[in-house]
């Protein structure tokens, strides 16, 4: 027990514990809701009829544990992964998360399994990097409380659903960590990846700018790298616009 307790106090152990707690809690609540609600699946977007039939007519375990996650934005992301932006309404969703889902499809994964695998792996990575950043900036006790605050946040289930939030937060926290180490081009690339995950990634240029100004005497010696990092999120947004329209 002492060994387990010591392991859970390490960054990855704490991150894994937080992730598993969130994953088990949300899966349990989703399964309970699916079992008690007569109409347990609602699809609010164009969907894959074959995939929907598999979920509706599958085993009880499939209906309770998998089907509740095939709804809302997940449906759109899977559609983009399968068909690209043939449906122009889907252009409001940037392409990086669907591209990673498509990678899972190329490996033979079920579409919903691929979507959940990407988001859940990103959630675990986000918890790990968040713990490390909080521990570095403050201490281990506050890092653990930070993970707890994320897990009990009312919309934390977004992190383990087939949504892009966990991937976005993974890139965002990695961007901030790189900026704190004054690795400007890496921070800019991570901000660009966040922008290709969610449009809000464009605003990661603000903490990059602030961090550079806050440490200006050192930043001045890396001025080209800093300016290049600042430009990358905007270039990513421009590239996405060109990709969609041309």
What are these regions (language model features)?
Residues 113-114, 130-152, 170:
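Transmembrane-helix signature of polytopic, membrane-embedded enzymes
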Residues 102-103, 117-137:
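Transmembrane-helix motifs of polytopic, lipid-linked glycan transferases
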């Amino acid at each position: 027990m002492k060994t387990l307790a010591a392991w859970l106090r390490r960054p990855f152990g704490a991150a894994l514990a937080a992730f598993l707690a969130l994953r088990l809690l949300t899966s349990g609540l989703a399964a309970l809701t699916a079992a008690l609600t007569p109409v347990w699946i609602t699809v609010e977007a164009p969907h894959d009829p074959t995939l929907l039939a598999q979920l509706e007519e599958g085993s009880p375990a499939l209906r309770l544990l998998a089907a509740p996650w095939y709804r809302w934005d997940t449906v759109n992301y899977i559609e983009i992964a399968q068909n690209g932006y043939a449906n122009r309404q889907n252009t409001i969703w940037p392409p990086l998360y669907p591209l990673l889902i498509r990678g899972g499809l190329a490996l033979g994964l079920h579409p919903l399994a691929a979507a959940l695998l990407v988001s859940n792996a990103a959630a675990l990575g986000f918890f790990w990097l968040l713990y490390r950043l909080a521990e570095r900036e403050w201490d281990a006790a506050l890092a653990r409380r930070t993970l707890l605050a994320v897990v009990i946040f009312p919309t934390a289930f977004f992190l383990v659903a087939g949504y892009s939030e966990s991937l976005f937060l993974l890139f965002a926290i990695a961007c901030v960590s790189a900026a704190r180490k004054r690795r400007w081009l890496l921070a800019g690339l991570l901000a660009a990846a966040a922008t290709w995950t969610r449009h809000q990634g464009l605003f990661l240029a603000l903490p990059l700018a602030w961090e550079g100004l806050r440490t200006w005497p050192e930043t001045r010696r890396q001025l080209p790298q800093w300016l290049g990092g600042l430009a990358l999120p905007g270039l990513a947004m421009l590239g996405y616009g060109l990709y969609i329209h041309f």
